[in-house]
Amino acid sequence: MTDENIRQIAFYGKGGIGKSTTSQNTLAAMAEMGQRIMIVGCDPKADSTRLMLHAKAQTTVLHLAAERGAVEDLELEEVMLTGFRGVKCVESGGPEPGVGCAGRGIITAINFLEENGAYQDLDFVSYDVLGDVVCGGFAMPIREGKAQEIYIVTSGEMMAMYAANNIARGILKYAHSGGVRLGGLICNSRKTDREAELIENLAERLNTQMIHFVPRDNIVQHAELRRMTVNEYAPDSNQGQEYRALAKKIINNDKLTIPTPIEMDELEALLIEYGILDDDTKHAEIIGKPANAK
């Protein structure tokens, strides 16, 4: 069973936004502060723990279960490894592409962990979830009442904001039945114009906060090449301090809200206001015309 005092958080975000990197660097900083943490990777890529373990990809619960015949045939020690600063690491894994539902695998893995005592002596459990759109499968940690506190990693790019709004819509769907709340937007900067201001504006419309603006810094890539978090690779770096600042904000966060997702027209108007998207009315005469059109 799960200790009621454990805070169960989840990081969602568009594919390629830097969600797994941001979450691992933040959780490493939280572990430095004495928080007892378990990461449950819910992405079929199984890359949610690699910086903690200095590994390419951790063997997943579903992969081992398929080898053995059933998840009941596994031992906890086979699927739960210990990484940087004692962080417990598990990857749920996913089915073969085009076969089955990843969400079913996620909940199978979580139930196995709960039944085998993995949730004892922890302060935080963090679910790292694929989430361009919160489909039924990847919403499983929310639907099943596991993840209670959601952080959306986004940026000032159109598709990242579009995904953030969709994820907010998924949270709203289960907010009243399951008690899940939005903890905030994390802006993982892509250096777009007026990016912090734009995400602050989006956060306000979604009835949440931009909990932190993470600046872009090549030291993140240098650390990733070594399969390390920034906090381990360059603990005194400015970027390491940014992740520590975000970690503190999450630990102390009491602004957990029911989101108010916006309509596509409002999102487009916001993007036009900040110059991310061109106003159709300005270019009505060229919309839909090929390059060779006169």
UniProtKB/Swiss-Prot annotation:
One GO molecular-function entry: metal ion binding
Post-translational modification: The reversible ADP-ribosylation of Arg-104 inactivates the nitrogenase reductase and regulates nitrogenase activity.
Residue list for modification ADP-ribosylarginine: 104
EC number: 1.18.6.1
Keyword field contains Lipid metabolism: no
Free-text comment on the cofactor: Binds 1 [4Fe-4S] cluster per dimer.
Annotated binding of [4Fe-4S] cluster, by residue: 101, 135
Family per record: Belongs to the NifH/BchL/ChlL family.
Subunit structure: Homodimer.
Protein name: Nitrogenase iron protein
UniProt source species: Anabaena sp. (strain L31)
Organism lineage string: Bacteria, Bacillati, Cyanobacteriota, Cyanophyceae, Nostocales
